[in-house]
Amino acid sequence: MAEQVTEATASGVFCSRILNMVNSEDVNAIILAQRHMLDRFEKTNEMLLNFNGLSNTRLQQMSDRFAHHTRTLVEMKKDLDIIFRRIRMLKGKLAKQYPESFNNVHESPILEDDDDFDPTPRSAATTIATSEQSTESCDTSPSIISPAMSQDFEDLSQAPSDTPSVNGQILTDEEVVHED
């Protein structure tokens, strides 16, 4: 029994010396730092969960829009295929009904293949394209596709202008002097 008392005393002495080596203020500081880090990690986790939820919502919205635009493009392609098929069919009918006239058309030069042919002057085309780009964003409304059908389309060729022009062409200073 005496040995057990000395062992308990020896182990008690050993534990008390180990506990005396550890500073309780340092332990409390470590615990406070860990609680502070835990709070920060919880806030960060909450922010990441909110961001993830928002990202999922945006992804769903964009996926829906992408699917809608893809369907629109597929439908437009089908419509164009039908239109071109009808055009080929009409060409075939015209070739059968009026073979001489149809052959004469193919022998004459085609204006569409001529790179120098431009029905609108460059300045007007640039002005129209720039005004459309600046007033509309990436919108697929009919006003972008066909400006002539839009009520908001501004016809620049009909507007009074301070610069002299003839037949839609802007005159240079020399031409203005000769014009007067």
UniProtKB/Swiss-Prot annotation:
Keyword Membrane annotated: yes
Keywords: Lysosome, Membrane
Record's subcellular location: Lysosome membrane
InterPro entries assigned to the protein according to its UniProt record, in alphabetical order: KXD1-like, KxDL_dom
Domain of life per record: Eukaryota
Region Disordered: start-end pairs: 126-180
Predominant location: membrane
Biased composition (Polar residues): 126-144, 158-170
Any Gene Ontology CC annotation: lysosomal membrane
One Pfam assignment: KxDL
UniProt-listed GO biological process terms: lysosome localization; vesicle-mediated transport
Main function: As part of a BORC-like complex may play a role in lysosomes movement and localization at the cell periphery. Associated with the cytosolic face of lysosomes, this complex may couple lysosomes to microtubule plus-end-directed kinesin motor. May also be involved in the biogenesis of lysosome-related organelles such as melanosomes.
Family: Belongs to the KXD1 family.
PANTHER family from the UniProt entry: KXDL MOTIF-CONTAINING PROTEIN 1 (PTHR13511:SF0)
Subunit comment: Associates with the BLOC-1 complex.
Name of protein: KxDL motif-containing protein 1
Organism: Xenopus tropicalis
Taxonomy of the source species: Eukaryota, Metazoa, Chordata, Craniata, Vertebrata
